Amino acid sequence: MNVNKYNSEGYYDPTAYEALTIIDREILQRRYTRPRRYMPKVYICSPFRGDVANNVIKTRAYCSFAVKQGRIPFASHLLFPQFMSDSDPNERNLALFMALVYLDCCKECWVFGDTISEGMENEIKYANRKNIPVRYFTEDCKEVFQ
């Protein structure tokens, strides 16, 4: 962008010139540092029951890993327990159903850890039925190739 040092009447105007130069620089900076336009959604599949507190910490780390990989993570077991009870069978079944709805919107299903729970198994089977790619990772976020 080109900023003129002179105002519309032809007089030298350093204040306006400096201000407009700074604005132009900020516009260019934003143009080249804005976040990516496309980030695929991934479903985070990891254990929840058992050691819930530790599993929540691990799942947060998995979501952080997904973001660093340029993905938008969704972990149903971080969201739904905020307002639904895992111990109530009706609410658990509803949460599992809603999780599958979200899984359907994702480009991939990422499975973490070496333990596959019953809920995880259902999510993996659903992803396979819907032809959603399933990728496996260790607890240290290293991909396991089969």
Which ranges hold each PLM region?
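Conserved catalytic or regulatory cores that recognize and/or transform ribose-phosphate-containing ligands
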Residues: M1-Q146
